[in-house]
């Protein structure tokens, strides 16, 4: 069989290259060989019929929880990678809050070995900012980078010590690593479990004010100005955080940010509308309609660089409990494109900006070799049917997690083919490869 693959007749949307039009993508030896309007295909060459579909660079997710090692009952690198390619993601960044925490080469190498064995999405490990993510002593950044980490985070745990955060930014700068930070002041969070506002009052639940995020974002931007380190703000959820990042960028500071599909599409009112469903409990919590508008505007104008899922699978035991006691987080790799395509239909985003925020935007934020269909780039591609409608059935997801707020929702937009390094690793309607 020929080692050449043709993706024919689709609308190629590649913001990194400025391409948007019907083209044929030619893949040879795992690389993009050509993107052209007219290409003659040899008889023995494999082909994907992409007529009436979008063809984009494979999606890049800067924020996923693959749970391995230590929590394989929730997810494994293999099941998470399978969910990723089913959603069009060809590269994912694995957060370090595993058991043990990824604060050393041994854990990083294990994650990479599991990813290689799965042979699906590319997995980029994120190392811990502090040893054990305990916020007391910095991890060995040189060791983490040398073993394959592309960024650093104590994800799920804010770095409460300003002195430690300063040292982390300085130390990470020496290795060219961004810090991707969960921003919340735990003193303001207290025992809160949802956004502080009228909805929390009606539901009788303790609230978390938006300012818990805002003050930490402002602090860390000030520390970036002091140190010159690179800051990436994880899962932005407040209007104040968007304003702070916008101003930091205006001043030329090395600050980037991401936002999740759920913080773009849901509000704190959905907690009550769902009947206290724990599939609507996450951290940061679903915010007010004003915050959602600000996040949408921030994504549309480029203040926020990337859409990231914060894919966080949990077992039923951890979710089928009272709202106060339930684990935070939802799965999102397989629904992200569909949910965000809804924003395009609402007029909140353009098609180009949606693709940009799923591809070259995140790739640039972390300096990853991804997010483009330029000649010579790795042939990581998503083929998408933007018109296809489907109903979310948690039992049919590839992830081990079933914790999705989109259960039973009718969504539009499916990934029909995912290609990694020139190999078709996902084809809708066919058995897993």
Swiss-Prot record:
Disulfide bonds: none annotated. GO terms for cellular component: cytoplasm. One of its GO terms (molecular function) is zinc ion binding. Its cofactor is Zn(2+). Substrate binds at residues 65-67, 97, 283, 314. Pfam families: Amidohydro_1. Belongs to the metallo-dependent hydrolases superfamily. DHOase family. Class I DHOase subfamily. This is Dihydroorotase.
């Amino acid at each position: 069989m020929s080692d050449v693959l043709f993706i024919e007749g689709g609308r190629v949307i590649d913001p990194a290259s400025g391409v948007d039009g019907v083209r044929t993508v030619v893949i040879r030896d795992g690389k993009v060989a050509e993107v052209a309007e007219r290409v003659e295909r040899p008889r023995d060459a494999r082909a994907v019929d992409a007529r009436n579909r979008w063809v984009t660079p494979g999606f890049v997710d800067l924020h996923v929880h693959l749970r391995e090692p230590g929590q394989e009952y929730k997810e494994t690198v293999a099941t998470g990678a399978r969910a990723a390619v089913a959603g069009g993601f060809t590269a994912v960044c694995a957060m370090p809050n595993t058991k043990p925490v990824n604060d050393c080469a041994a854990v990083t190498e294990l994650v990479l070995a599991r990813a290689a064995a799965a042979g699906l999405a590319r997995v980029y490990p994120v190392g811990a900012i502090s040893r054990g993510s305990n916020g007391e002593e910095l991890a060995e950044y040189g060791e983490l980078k040398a073993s394959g980490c592309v960024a650093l985070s104590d994800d799920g745990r804010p770095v409460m010590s300003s002195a430690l955060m300063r040292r982390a930014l300085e130390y990470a700068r020496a290795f060219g690593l961004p810090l991707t930070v969960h921003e919340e002041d735990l003193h303001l969070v207290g025992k809160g479990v949802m956004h502080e506002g009228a909805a929390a009052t009606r539901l009788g639940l303790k609230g978390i004010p938006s300012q818990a995020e805002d003050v930490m974002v402002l602090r860390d931007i000030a520390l970036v100005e002091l140190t010159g380190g690179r800051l990436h703000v994880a899962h932005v959820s407040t209007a104040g955080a968007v304003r702070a990042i916008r101003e930091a960028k205006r001043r030329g500071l090395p600050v980037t940010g991401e936002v999740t599909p759920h913080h773009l599409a849901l509000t704190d009112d959905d907690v009550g509308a769902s009947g206290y469903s724990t599939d609507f409990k996450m951290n940061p919590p679903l915010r007010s309609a004003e915050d959602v508008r600000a996040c949408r505007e921030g994504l549309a104008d480029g203040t926020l660089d990337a859409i990231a899922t914060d894919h966080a699978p949990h077992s039923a035991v951890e979710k089928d409990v009272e709202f106060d006691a339930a684990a935070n987080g939802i799965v999102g790799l397989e629904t992200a494109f569909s949910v965000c395509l809804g924003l395009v239909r609402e007029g909140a985003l353009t098609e180009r900006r949606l693709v940009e925020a799923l591809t070259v935007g995140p790739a640039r934020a972390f300096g990853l070799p991804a997010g483009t269909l330029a000649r010579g780039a790795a042939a990581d591609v998503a083929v998408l049917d933007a018109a296809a409608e489907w109903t979310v059935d948690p039992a049919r997801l590839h992830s081990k997690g079933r914790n999705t707020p989109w259960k039973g929702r009718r969504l539009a937009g499916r990934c029909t083919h995912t290609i990694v390094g020139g190999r078709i690793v996902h084809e809708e309607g066919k058995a897993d490869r």
